[in-house]
Amino acid sequence: MTALLELCNVSRSYPSGEEQVAVLKDISLQIHAGEMVAIVGVSGSGKSTLMNILGCLDKPTSGTYRVAGRDVSTLDPDALAQLRREHFGFIFQRYHLLSHLTAAQNVEIPAVYAGIERKKRQARARELLLRLGLSDRVDYPPSQLSGGQQQRVSIARALMNGGQVILADEPTGALDSHSGEEVMAILRQLRDRGHTVIIVTHDPLIAAQAERIIEIHDGKIVHNPPAQEKKREQGVDAAVVNTAPGWRQFASSFREALSMAWLAMAANKMRTLLTMLGIIIGIASVVSIVVVGDAAKQMVLADIRAMGTNTIDIHPGKDFGDDNPQYRQALKYDDLVAIQKQPWVNSATPSVSKSLRLRYGNIDIAVNANGVSGDYFNVYGMSFREGNTFNAVQQQDRAQVVVLDANTRRQLFPNKANVVGEVVLVGNMPVIVIGVAEEKPSMYGNSNLLQVWLPYSTMSDRIMGQSWLNSITVRVKDGVDSDQAEQQLTRLLTLRHGKKDFFTWNMDSVLKTAEKTTYTLQLFLTLVAVISLVVGGIGVMNIMLVSVTERTREIGIRMAVGARASDVLQQFLIEAVLVCLVGGALGISLSMFIAFMLQLFLPGWEIGFSLTALASAFLCSTFTGILFGWLPARNAARLDPVDALARE
């Protein structure tokens, strides 16, 4: 008769300081299919070590161990996990049920790692619990089950994948006599159904119920009667086999790992929430800074554009502050006409200005009077609250008309509904008000100077008596590169003047400088927020490391029922990523609340959440979970199942 399990000259020793302590010494043993064997011995005799080797939880230091003819020493860790999963079922003295799972979910664990479809394994788990008399306790957690009921759940778990070999370590040690008898009766029934049952015990009454008693003392077998071949009534229950394609097995495995991770998180809600807190704050900081910073940047750029978008100013001289008399009259009206003819020019306006007194009735105020063309307001993107700008005829006739700014209107006409047609004195010249320009808010604040605008011909001839222009402002057409336009403008005027007696000021350079400055500031603040996210990630790693330590026995149980190192790695990594993703979602919600509150207090700000910001937050959460969850997950996957099961 060929042995199902065969040990040949097996020894097992462990390092103790600089020495090796032998626990098993030259063990040779054969166990046949369908036997019920008891391994007895006092504490420290090596019987538990022998059981670990039989169950492929441990490997011998020397000698050969074969399972159904396969040499275990030739198998890698994944193959050993498969062997445990498909051939062995473990029953422990302390049951080793996972407290956050129900009875049925505990029974399903081996089938989860075997890749069995959910419906099939749920049906099998309920069938096994029904057979063991626990049909009314299927959805109960272990804390609501008696010791005997918990051990029956443990037996059902051992049978989930078929359980060809049942390894029972002191199965009645924690039970009362009645429950112990029930468990032993179940084990005998399993023996009768063709299962190979190996009981490790120090109780002679339990051992006496086995067909064969193997006694071990000080690491050596001192009594080993020959096996007795018996005919069994039935064969071993066939395990449920997974026939799904590879990609479906992977998807199922990932889904189950996600489900187990969620259950583990739900079992420690407060700790999970505190772990998430750092991620919530970090993600909220990053997202808030990105969206609020973007809103602030757009507001700054809008204010700059309000000063004149896509405009180029031309001034006489070499630079600002140059009052050399030879350059004072550099810009002429003919220059303006030549500029207006260029195909890339949208509009152009001259400018002459002087500080004057403005009077209406008994009100006398100081204003800055500007001589401009009718295109001035188009160049600077200004709209009218009342009336309109001056036309070409008024400019040609040097008409005595004026446009007021909103502040000047309030000073002169605080109680009038419409001021168009009113006559005021600019200097000593009476002029008719034809419009009120809408004031535009600026990031630099509003000037304390009151502004009025007259036709430049009126200003030059009637008030100032000069034929040259103080400056020209050009608005470039949309789509035209302002730098190229500036170069062409410089070339045009240099050719006309025969020299470069002017300088230009491109508002786009101000815009680009502001964009660069706001981007730098936003980047700096984002880096500060990322630091808080990193701190949150370190918190996740710290808690996950603690979790691995606290759940060491759970890891050992999972490995005993067939989990591979990669399964354990996947589960703990998914837990870390899930914590970070949920924390990220809450962080995004918090940032939306912050944005909502800011808009209540800062109504002018347009805060919006782009898909880019949300996708970035999602990726940050995922990356943080992977980065800071890797070390704890790797530590969990590297645990030795024997050491893990021995931890309290």
UniProtKB/Swiss-Prot annotation:
Q: Which UniProt keywords apply?
A: Antibiotic resistance, ATP-binding, Cell inner membrane, Cell membrane, Membrane, Nucleotide-binding, Translocase, Transmembrane, Transmembrane helix, Transport
Q: Does the keyword Phosphoprotein apply?
A: no
List GO molecular-function terms, semicolon-separated.
ATP binding; ATP hydrolysis activity; transmembrane transporter activity
Record SUPFAM superfamilies: P-loop containing nucleoside triphosphate hydrolases (SSF52540)
Give all residue intervals belonging to the ABC transporter domain: 5-243
Any Pfam family the entry gives: ABC_tran
Q: Where in the cell is it found?
A: Cell inner membrane
Principal location: membrane
Which segments cross the bilayer? 273-293, 417-437, 523-543, 577-597, 611-631
Q: How does this chain sit within the bilayer? A: Multi-pass membrane protein
Q: Is Chaperone one of the keywords UniProt gives this record?
A: no
Q: Name one GO biological process term.
A: response to antibiotic
CDD domains in the record, alphabetically? ABC_MJ0796_LolCDE_FtsE (cd03255)
Give the E.C. number(s): 7.6.2.-
Which family does the UniProt entry place this protein in?
Belongs to the ABC transporter superfamily. Macrolide exporter (TC 3.A.1.122) family.
Q: How does it assemble?
A: Homodimer. Part of the tripartite efflux system MacAB-TolC, which is composed of an inner membrane transporter, MacB, a periplasmic membrane fusion protein, MacA, and an outer membrane component, TolC. The complex forms a large protein conduit and can translocate molecules across both the inner and outer membranes. Interacts with MacA.
Q: Its function?
A: Part of the tripartite efflux system MacAB-TolC. MacB is a non-canonical ABC transporter that contains transmembrane domains (TMD), which form a pore in the inner membrane, and an ATP-binding domain (NBD), which is responsible for energy generation. Confers resistance against macrolides.
Protein name per the record: Macrolide export ATP-binding/permease protein MacB
Species of origin: Salmonella typhi
